[in-house]
Amino acid sequence: MVFNLATSQALRAVARTSVASRAQIMPSVIATPLSVRFLATPSSSSKPPPPSPSGSPASSKPAKAESTDDAQSQPQPQPPAEPELARKGSSLFDIDTSATPLASQLIEAEEAASRSDAGKGSTRAKAKTGARSMSSIERRRQNTVRILTGFVLIGAGLSAYKLGRPWESSAEAERFADSADAQTFVGRIKLRLNAMYDDYNKPLFEQLLPDPLPFPYSRPFTMVIDIDDLLVHSEWSREHGWRTAKRPGLDHFLGYLSQFYEIVLFTTQPFFTAGPIIEKLDPDRRFITYTLFRESCRTVDGKLVKDLNHLNRDLSKVVVVDTNPDSFHLHPENGILVKPWKGEREDRELIGLIPFFEAIGIYNIDDVRNTIKAYTGTHIPTEHARRTAAIRERELADNKARLERMGKFGSVFGRVSRSASAGLPADKTLYDLERERYLQAYLEEQKYWNENGDAIRKQAKDEQDRQIREMKINTWGFFTGGLKPQQPETPAQ
């Protein structure tokens, strides 16, 4: 009931607003944007403008009578409230509740309650910003994180101590003897970490190939050759899937040069992708002596490199043939770069390289690196053909001149001249004779395999099956040390 009385008093105070004040408010309402929610009005302390003198007295008399009736029906406002209204700005939503003492008491009680609530609210705000209660799962997670962090810090400290300890073996001391960081704690940590990374990037084994075979099974030179876009080219299509084609002249290239070179197929592919292709290239393993895969490479500056230092061969007798210069990045003097093959049928690059590698084998070059350096920046098949033709013409001219000199003494030393000229024809050089000999040996080997290849393969397959049968063993044989021989069955009486 008290609240209803205060509300009615407030509504009457709003209705008491003068007409002149409304006239002053209208321009500001029009000038204010429509998006503004609360409209500012002049301060309650400002006096309303005086009425216009042109106004009629009759219109002012009813206003005076109305204000007199309102003043008689409502009590006079409290004097102390006027300074407060003068300090605070008024708005359309300001309500003068100072008309009755009861309303003032209600307002004071409300303000006291609000102040007490504000104090409690500030305490609650502080409580909210402070530590909040945690569930058991969150508390367990927090404890777990703290424990794991402690273990990590302890492990990091122990690892740093172990890496920075003094050299314990003479091998480590000799390995890092030339380093300036070998005498400091942090320097030893750095050296050991770099050594671990270097050991991880090294090939799988220290020696990738076994020791060379004894004569006559060994070859004087070693050819390290890649497979991707050098010997074969693989492509994929929706109709056929993956298909692999051999480069023209591949069989002759491998078969003929295997007489001079120990052919090592070294690819950057893993075994499970390159193994089936190698089985198709050389099913009888007649030409390819060894195979090395991605596991035998190492990483240098983010590149896959074939490190010849781990090949267990004399580098003066090693030739690397590849389509990627990064493969022989550590040994560029041993590498020959070949144009990649993309499946062209008219390609003759491998056939053109055969005379160059053949000449190295026939002349038994002491250091192949000097020969490769002499052909740097040239197309080797074309340049070698030009140089070989010039050398052959010069040798043929020397042979002809020698035969002419020997012919002058034919009457005296006829038999000797005929025997000397019979061993070396006038139209052939020593290189031509050696080339014919190796070519004849290659043709004879091809003929032998064409005639006896099936029988040799069948014999190898039978031997493989026999070894597999001998390897089979059951559980009883594993515990008893072998299977007992079966006794022959005796016929029933």
UniProtKB/Swiss-Prot annotation:
Leader sequence segment: none
Official protein name in the record: Mitochondrial import inner membrane translocase subunit TIM50
InterPro entries: FCP1_dom, HAD-like_sf, HAD_sf, TIM50
Similarity annotation: Belongs to the TIM50 family.
Membrane topology of this protein: Single-pass membrane protein
Lineage of the species this protein comes from: Eukaryota, Fungi, Dikarya, Basidiomycota, Ustilaginomycotina
Subunit architecture: Component of the TIM23 complex, at least composed of TIM23, TIM17, TIM50 and TIM21. Interacts with preproteins in transit.
Keywords, alphabetical: Membrane, Mitochondrion, Mitochondrion inner membrane, Protein transport, Transit peptide, Translocation, Transmembrane, Transmembrane helix, Transport
Span list, region Disordered: 40-86, 109-138
